[in-house]
């Protein structure tokens, strides 16, 4: 940083929430890093978020409590926020400013990078085609995640999204390249007990060695919450495109991120958009989600799994609605399955992976994968219709085939969707379980599966020549 770029002012005209207004600044840049020196000599940092008519608004990371409009100095540093990043960060826990939260030493090696990153040139993007095994049957079998994809999880209040996120972080891998796989885990505005759960889970399972955690708590200033996914993705980009690693970025909870955006927008007295959220929330979310992907000529990749809580389980709420426009599908957690004691309570009919078709099949997962998933979807959808009919006319009035569909639905939920927190299923195991639950139905009902796959994988024929 050149000292020639540093400008110092002392005329703070307003302090409101996490913002301060500085008069007389004519050349401030958006997202420029600012240093505030208090009368007692202590310092805080912030970013320029707006500048108009000679007044510049600065968002203070540590909050504005204790800042005095008289006696405080505001320095504009002529650069964006940079964080030192390195491979040393794997196995460690940091705040979004890159400062350790695990009582370990600061990062010594590595390099400083602007947390806003550089957008991937669309012409250099490579289409996702490699399967990532999460060990979760409802994802791997029916809504497969591909390397370079962005696939969010839509949860509801009280549903086990945290447990599922931790399990995926522990189990996910690109088969054959396990040693070259890393997880960047951003916990945004979580409660202290949730942050402690993630830390203990990763440490006790040994997954911490390949995980870099970035954490902000619920009582942290909104400006820090907004920085969390950006810093995490800056490390992900470094590991993927400089160190040729396959990186899975898990961002939880993006609802807290959007609430922080709304809080800052209200502090700036901006005209609210839909649901009271700022009108630029779609663009802001896109700057985060679009940092996932593969680049032609680079061995590494960034795969994203943003996780968000739907207020009132409403998928039409602005946060899940806008997220769905940007990402490539969604995994939806269902309260009725959760109330049945099924974990993970993934509603496969509401879930979708738009890129799945390009990452499954012979040479990628197994030759029967596509046919089997189509049949499981169709059979479960029909079973749900039959459940509704049975609730009206009673099971005794159903045909024999319809009653078998009811048995199939129960087995599908209890044996295919449900699995243990520490149960890591290979894709072969997942597909075999799918065949086992389908074997409840008459063979004549398996109209979406080619006969050669039935002869090869159906339990009635498996192992026979």
Curated annotation (Swiss-Prot):
InterPro entries: ATP-synt_VA_C, ATPase_a/bsu_AS, ATPase_A1-cplx_bsu, ATPase_F1/V1/A1_a/bsu_N, ATPase_F1/V1/A1_a/bsu_nucl-bd, P-loop_NTPase, V-ATPase_su_B/beta
GO cellular component entries: plasma membrane; proton-transporting two-sector ATPase complex, catalytic domain
Pfam family, one: ATP-synt_ab_N
Listed GO MF terms: ATP binding; proton-transporting ATP synthase activity, rotational mechanism; proton-transporting ATPase activity, rotational mechanism
KW Membrane (keyword) present: yes
Membrane-topology descriptor: Peripheral membrane protein
Subunit structure and binding partners: Has multiple subunits with at least A(3), B(3), C, D, E, F, H, I and proteolipid K(x).
GO BP term, example: proton motive force-driven plasma membrane ATP synthesis
Family: Belongs to the ATPase alpha/beta chains family.
Its biological purpose: Component of the A-type ATP synthase that produces ATP from ADP in the presence of a proton gradient across the membrane. The B chain is a regulatory subunit.
Entry protein name: A-type ATP synthase subunit B
Protein's UniProt keywords contain Membrane: yes
PANTHER family: V-TYPE PROTON ATPASE SUBUNIT B
Subcellular location: Cell membrane
Keywords: ATP synthesis, Cell membrane, Hydrogen ion transport, Ion transport, Membrane, Transport
Superkingdom: Archaea
